[in-house]
Amino acid sequence: MLRLPLKNGTVENYKLVGTPLTPQTPSISFNRIAFAAAHVVASPLFEVDPWQLSGALDWNETLKYRRYLWDQGLNVAEAMDTAQRGMGLDWETAKELIERTVNEARHHPLKPRVVCGAGTDQFGIEDFKNEDQIINAYSEQMETIEKIGGQCVILASRAMMIVSRGPESFLRVYNRLIEQAEKPVILHWLGAMFDPALRGYWGTESISEAVSYTHLTLPTR
């Protein structure tokens, strides 16, 4: 039963009708690998200072939602900037989220894949003065993810926009990260439409040039 507000300021009871859809595992194999950037479920029972950027999550409901996605044959992209990190989930909470999700996936009958966002958000943007500091920050998160058992998704970093000297800076940083990774990585970048501070990422505002840099120059694993 839902209680819906009306235009006249009153509330009306509304009863849902019909048969809810039941999640079903696909009967045939996907010809693509599909990852769901799953959201988290906030707990209304914990008092949290939003200015401290620490999340209060309902872990039971958060993991239940992931099982719901896995039951339908989807994989999960965890701790992503688009789903959680860009909305304020700090690295410490993201790290716990990654660990819980990876462990939960191990016990799921479909053995779903979990890829996890690695960024530089354990530090403030003002802390970065050079490319090596960015590499070290990325490496710290990547090593944590790999130790837990996840596969890394390299998230775009605002810090690169501060210290970058052009395309060569991006190629140097990303080459290092890809070469040292234990498994193939996924590059994740949505550009200015997601975050205006990322305008000109890869050292250019041209999509075709950015694609040529990443496709032709970065190593493949």
Spans of features found by a protein language model:
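Conserved small/polar residues in nucleotide/adenosyl-binding loops
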Residues: 214-220
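Active-site glycine-rich loop that binds ribose-phosphate moieties when present
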Residues: 204-213
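Active-site beta->alpha loop and helix N-cap motifs at the rims of alpha/beta catalytic domains
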Residues: 32-205
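Hydrophobic transmembrane signal anchors and adjacent membrane-proximal interface regions, especially
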Residues: 4-6, 160, 215
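N-terminal amphipathic alpha-helix/helix-capping segment at the start of soluble metabolic enzymes
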Residues: 1-38, 62
